[in-house]
Amino acid sequence: MKSATCLTATVAAALLAAARLASATDMPSAEEMWKIIQQQQREIEALKRGQQETAEKVEAAAELAEQSQPSVSTASSWAENTQIGGYGEMHYDNLDSGKQIDFTRFVLFFDHQFTDRLRFFSEVEIEHVIASSDEDDKGEVEVEQAYVEYDLTPTQHAKAGLFLLPVGILNETHEPTTFYGVQRNPVETYIIPTTWWAGGVGLKGEITPGWSYDFDVHEGLDTSASDDYAVRSGRQKTSEADANDLASTARIKWTGTPGVELAASVQYQQNVTQGNDPNAGDAWLYEAHADIQRGPYGLRALYARWDLDGRGPKAIGADEQEGYYIEPSYKFTPKVGIFGRFNQWDNQAGGNGNNTEMKQYNAGVNFWPHPDVVLKADVQMQDNDGAKNDNGYNLGIGYVF
């Protein structure tokens, strides 16, 4: 027992001595310790710099994300508040005056809602496909609408810019899917010069439920004796328009029964030649119409008349220019409808001794394969005493989106 105890003590002493010897041998010097401390300090500083750079990158990324968010939101808001649309029509005319195919109109709409009360409307049109300086090209590029509208109240609105005048049935709504016949009717072409737009300001609103009004002040016509004072030739289209004599247009409209529109318009201009012709004076336009669609039955009727003052218009009978048409229609289905129309107009109805009255009969069919696409066909017959008749048929296709 005593031997075992001594052996244990001897082994322990030997191990302790070996450990002390090893510790003494492995212990770094003071210089080595200083180098180790400096290396560790450099590593700590490098880690701090890395952490700082990482923090700066994270902060920059966050700021960029914050800056990008309004841009994305703005782009999304712009897209939601902007609308693009348009319409177009192509005609094939086979008439006594000639045969032709014409892509008559290509139109695009661009509208934008700035706020709940402020909005913008525009319409750009290319007529006859090609517009150039070549005299053989009949095309035109036209801005027919570009105006801002503001809601004074929920039922009263003000506008300023370039807009369509509130006269007739077709002038404000003339997309090909909305009317019968390939060509627009002649009364709303030669007496009411559709499409008729002008630059100015206006008010419109509801008077009572079913009754509404429009009142506009805008550029006037600029007719001339060389064009027989024809009103269509006097449109200035707000292209450096002469504004010596402005015009005023007012309309009252009743839509108190679904499918029924009754309206009357009046326009006054102090001088229909903008003061350029001493033999011409003021001009008044009077127009009334009914547009009725009750079930499959439809009826459109319109009367319009111009009274032009002055010796010049009176000498050739242009002091009175008037016309009317009546157009019944019937829809067999929502896709197929037929119509007939009688048109009579005269741009020299003042009694100059010449028979200048024009009469035209149209009958045809519309087919809508889709509510926004239409195929049309009609026949045209004229009965003119003082001019050559232009008879034949027309085919057309139109769309709107």
Label the model's feature ranges.
Residues 367, 372-373, 389-401:
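Outer-membrane beta-barrel "beta-signal"
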Residues 72-223, 244-261, 327-332, 336-339, ...:
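Outer membrane beta-barrel
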Residues 22-92, 401:
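N-terminal periplasmic/intermembrane-space "pro-region" immediately following the signal or transit peptide
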Residues 329, 335-372, 376:
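Outer membrane beta-barrel transmembrane domains
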Residues 93-96, 131-134, 185-189, 234-238, ...:
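Extracellular loop and loop/strand-boundary signature of outer-membrane beta-barrel proteins
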Residues 253-349:
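Detector for outer-membrane/organellar transmembrane beta-barrel domains
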Residues 104, 126, 142-144, 197, ...:
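Transmembrane beta-barrel architecture of outer-membrane proteins
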